[in-house]
Swiss-Prot record:
Keywords: Activator, Cell cycle, Cell division, Cytoplasm, Cytoskeleton, DNA-binding, Mitosis, Nucleus, Transcription, Transcription regulation. Residues 396-471, 562-586, 712-736, 809-832 are annotated as: Disordered. InterPro entries: Storkhead-box_winged-helix (IPR019391), STOX1/2 (IPR040126). Residues 809-830 have a biased composition (Polar residues). It holds the Pfam family Stork_head. The keyword Cell division applies. This is Storkhead-box protein 1. Transmembrane segments: none annotated. Residues 416-431 have a biased composition (Basic residues). The keyword Cytoplasm applies.
């Protein structure tokens, strides 16, 4: 047992009491009372001994109840005793001294200590101190801190340090992160590290205050420094620690010098670590802790193993550890790497940065980065370019360069729409369109206003003469004869793109034509079925997307044309005026369309009152130069043609023409049987002027070329021509035909009259296709070719087809209203001439061609082949007047027509002159859907000789072929949304 130790030897106790009772609540501390007592006695200048003794007093302690303990050397203590005896001792202000006496030394029995210090405790204290000083705690820095601040203990080895730290982590006393070691506090897992560090420092300060009572070597006993200054015989109560401040400071300086020497010896091994630790030391200089950055010789691999060993145990519930920083916390970045200044990033040369990048990641080279950057920039530019809508320009350019694909696509849609035929969708569209829009195909039904296609050029500027025509085109009746025949030779398709080889796609498209009749649309809103070619498609500028505005402008400036012989019924729709069915608008009636040959093959159709019709046809035929165009008359249509005045002066002149045409028909054998057009029955007109009106409407050119054409063909050739003509509606779906025969002068002044549903247009027998000039469009084929087989065709058709007798739109004339055109004289001035048939005996009804401009397309439908009889379906009473029946053509006859057309087109291009209208010719040929195959025996010498014989006819025909756009433009100027019979059907329909 250790000997007892005397505490506070030679001390003196002073018992003080306040002078007033109220001062007890606010009793000052012991040190304050001590200073007040010493100051009061030091001012006793008259008593020098007392003043000197008071100045040497030392504060020993303060006890509750006003006991002040002081300590002084023995002579000073004796002076205080003598002054108290003489009542010369002065108390502090506000108090009085009640008693003064000596205190015996306090005896204390010291407790023995162990000679070893727990390393875990020392490590926890060191980590807490470093955390309070905001110094990163690593194994290296921890060892340095132990050497500097705990010199009395032995420095542990790296293995011992590693294992001790692991044990502390398992005991949840410390934890490790990528930033070092930290002390675990009650709030460690709930708040961030910053408050924890403050709490740690507070706890450490509290522990430091309670250190003197613990008696451990880790606690500083600076509080004992004051009594030790008084005692010369001071000694250390424990040899394992330095309890005195002077000795501790000296030892720290000595250890720092030794640490520097050791650091110099190991500088080569720990360069990067020393660099980092020097920065740490400089950062913690304000903590008044002597930090020695000297590293200790230990292996880094074990440090890694230690860090990973306890990582997952301590952080399983806190956060994902950053283990990758553990091994490189004191080694990254290397010393040779330049440090980039945060303020100015341009101090490091680019080559140095490139070298650093290559050192970090050799794969991520500068070249790859450059290429990637360029690629991404290009991608962003392209994305921005597309987002601005410039892709439309690219598509437009592509459309200009590849019009062939556009034509093929349009033709494919047209053929597909034919297959759909009588779909409910088509009927629904027909009802929704109303009577003011005449749809031709599904693509045309949607357009209510004429639009310029994307690929078409800008409309050209009109000349003054064209502007005059355009202004007066609204009312063609006011045009004088000097304004006609002005611009009809100009090319309306100038500037449009050529159609490249679009003919080659026609074969596949044409094969899609069905063989079933299609009933579409009611009478009130007539329209062409999707499967049949629209009879007004050529002239409908609103429903024909391929025609640009340029064509319309030029055609509007062209001469107005007076139509000749379209069939136009007189119904309530027409009685309402041209608002429902405007003039110059070919209204649908494909199922009622048939060739004149077919109408002649039907017996019993004509009655006695209808005998004047063949006379009118024959008379009108004899006034035209059909092929060669040698009689180009410059006469304008008289003003009488634009009215329904039955007393016109031209009736007498036309009687001779009727006689001529009757004589010509008898020569051709067309009047052998009472050919009827029962499918073309019109409403009966009871006024006496109908005969004269019919004659005025049918100013049909003379047939001078018929005899010349008949002379060039033998019987065998006529047989072949008849077979080639047997396909009705070449280039069309049904037996659609129109009788629109006009003279050369009429090609300039006449308009193609519209026809209402249930009434169709006629072409003359013999398969003669009529072009836009009123001339038959069958190159190298005469009317006698088909007339030679007329009787045979008639007999075969009657034998094979029990349904051969056609039915009209109305079973009798009473089913349909019979309005008189004379009721609307103001509107009749805009009604084209026309003639109508009805099953009942009627006289041909003629309507006025007031809107006579640009619509003289002559659709031809030839006699059907004898091997494939005509199927003329009879309508049911419920269907009458509602849905026209579209006639399909048979595939064998279609192929015959296609191959023969191939030869005719070749000869036409070889003999025809190269003119400015060639783009137009290609445009016409592209929409015909012809195929260029030749496997039907048409390549025989007979056909070639037939073509060469009529090459001269081709020249005259080609000159008249290009007047179609001029007709169409005038029609477009009337703002009439109608569809033509063909979509630019070429004149050669075989």
């Amino acid at each position: 047992m250790a000997r007892p130790v005397q505490l506070a030897p030679g001390s003196l106790a002073l018992v003080l009491s306040p002078r007033e009772a109220g001062q007890a609540a606010g009793e000052p501390g012991g040190r304050a009372l001590f200073r007040a007592f010493r100051r009061a006695n030091a001012r006793c200048f008259w008593n020098a001994r007392l003043a000197r003794a008071a100045s040497r007093l030392a504060f020993l302690g303060w006890l509750r109840r006003g006991v002040l303990l002081v300590r002084a050397p023995q002579p000073c203590v004796q002076v205080l005793r003598d002054a108290w005896r003489r009542r010369a001792l002065r108390p502090p202000r506000g108090f009085r001294i009640t008693a003064v006496g000596d205190v015996f030394p306090v005896q204390m029995s010291p407790i023995a200590q162990c000679r070893f210090v727990p390393l875990a405790e020392v490590l926890c204290c060191a980590i807490a101190d470093m955390n309070a000083a905001q110094v990163m705690v690593t194994q290296q820095s921890l060892l340095e801190h132990l050497i500097k601040h705990y010199p009395g203990i032995a420095v542990p080895s790296p293995d011992i340090l590693y294992s001790t730290l692991g044990a502390l982590i398992q005991e949840r006393k410390i934890y490790h992160t990528g930033e070092g070691y930290f002390i675990v506090t009650p709030s460690t897992y709930f708040i961030t590290n910053t408050p924890m560090q403050g709490n740690k420092s507070a706890l450490l300060s509290n522990e430091g205050c309670s250190g003197p009572t613990s008696g451990t070597y880790l606690v500083s006993v600076d509080c004992c420094a004051e009594p030790t200054q008084e005692n010369e015989a001071l000694f250390s109560h424990c040899p394992s620690c330095q309890c005195y401040p002077d000795t501790s400071m000296c030892d720290s300086k000595d250890l720092l010098t030794a640490a520097e020497v050791t650091r110099k010896s190991q500088e080569g091994l720990e360069e990067t670590t020393a660099l980092t630790e020097n920065q740490v030391v400089s950062a913690s200089e304000d903590t008044h802790i002597c930090v020695n950055p000297k590293p200790l010789p230990y292996t880094k691999d074990k440090g890694k193993r230690f860090g990973f060993g306890f990582l997952w145990r301590s952080l399983s519930r806190k956060e994902k550890p950053k283990a990758e920083y553990h091994s490189f916390s004191a080694q990254f970045p290397p010393e040779e790497w330049p440090v980039r200044d945060e303020d100015s990033s341009t101090k490091i040369p680019r080559d140095v940065e490139h070298a650093l990048i290559k050192r970090i990641n050799p794969v991520l080279t500068v070249d790859n980065l450059t290429k990637h950057t360029a690629l991404m920039q290009k991608y962003e530019e392209q994305k921005k370019y597309n987002s601005q809508g410039t892709s439309m320009d690219i598509l437009t350019t592509r459309h200009k360069d590849s019009s062939k694909e556009v034509i093929g696509k349009r033709q494919g849609q047209f053929a597909k729409s034919r297959r759909r035929g009588s779909s409910h969708k088509g009927r629904h569209k027909a009802r929704s369109q109303g009577s003011e829009l005449e749809p031709g195909n599904p693509g045309q039904e949607k357009e209510k206003q004429p639009k310029v296609p994307a690929a078409q050029p800008a409309p050209r500027t009109k000349s003054p003469s064209e502007q005059v025509h355009h202004l007066q085109g609204r009312n063609p009746a006011v045009l004088g004869s000097h304004l006609i025949y002005k611009k009809q030779i100009n090319n309306p398709f100038q500037g449009m793109h050529l159609r490249k080889h679009s003919v080659s796609k026609g074969h596949a498209v044409q094969k899609t034509h069905g063989l079933k009749p299609t009933c579409v649309g009611p009478e009130e809103k007539p329209f062409w079925s999707a499967g049949s070619s629209d009879p007004s498609g050529v002239f409908d500028g609103e429903a024909q997307p391929p025609y640009p505005e340029q064509c319309r402008d030029k055609l509007e400036a062209g001469s107005t044309q007076v139509a000749k012989a379209p069939v136009h019924p007189v119904s309530d729709d027409f009685r309402g005026g041209p608002g429902n069915y405007p003039p110059r608008r070919v209204l649908p009636g494909p199922s009622r369309c048939c060739s004149f040959r077919e109408s002649m093959l039907r017996p019993g159709v004509y009655h006695e009152e209808n005998k004047d019709l063949p006379e009118v046809l024959r008379k009108s035929w004899s006034t035209c130069d059909m092929f060669l165009g040698t009689k180009e008359k410059k006469q304008a249509l008289p003003a009488q043609r634009c009215s329904l005045d039955p007393d016109s002066s031209s009736v007498h002149a036309e009687d001779k023409t009727v006689d001529k045409i009757l004589h010509q028909f008898q020569n051709l054998g067309l009047l052998d049987c009472p050919a009827g057009a029962n499918r073309l029955r019109t409403h009966e007109r009871q006024d006496g002027n109908s005969e004269e009106l019919s004659r005025k409407a049918l100013q049909i050119p003379e047939a001078e070329i018929v005899n010349m054409e008949n002379e060039g063909l033998s019987d065998s050739e006529q047989d072949q021509v008849a077979l080639s003509h047997s396909d009705p509606g070449a280039g069309d779906d049904g037996g659609c035909s129109s009788l629109c025969l006009e003279d050369d002068d009429f090609s300039e002044t006449d308009d193609f009259c519209p026809s209402l549903p249930g009434h169709t247009q006629h072409s003359f027998a013999g398969g003669g296709t009529w072009n836009h000039l009123g001339t038959p469009a069958m190159t190298g084929k005469s009317l006698t070719d088909c007339n030679s087989k007329a009787h045979r065709l008639e007999l075969l058709a009657i034998e094979r087809n029990p349904w051969y007798k056609a039915t009209g739109l109305f079973s009798n004339a009473g089913e349909s209203p019979n309005p008189d055109l004379s009721d609307n004289p103001g509107q009749n001035s805009r009604i084209p001439w026309g003639f109508n048939y009805e099953g009942e005996p009627t006289v041909a009804h003629v309507q006025t061609p007031a809107a006579a401009a640009g619509r003289s397309l002559l659709a031809c439908s030839t006699v059907r082949t004898t091997s494939f009889p005509v199927e003329i379906l009879q309508e049911s009473p419920g269907d009458r007047g509602k849905s026209p029946i579209v006639w399909r053509q048979s595939l064998p006859s279609q192929e015959m027509k296609e191959h023969f057309t191939d030869k005719l087109q070749l000869v036409k291009t070889s003999h025809g002159p190269v003119s400015a209208q060639e783009p137009q010719g290609e445009h016409l040929e592209g929409t015909e859907n012809y195929s260029m195959t030749g496997d039907s025996g048409i390549d025989s010498p007979r056909t070639q000789s037939l073509v060469s014989t009529n090459s001269a006819i081709l020249d005259g025909f080609k000159r008249r072929q290009h007047f179609l756009p001029n007709r169409e433009g005038v029609q477009k100027s009337q703002n009439l949304a109608s569809n033509s019979l063909f979509q630019l059907t070429p004149a050669i329909n075989v």
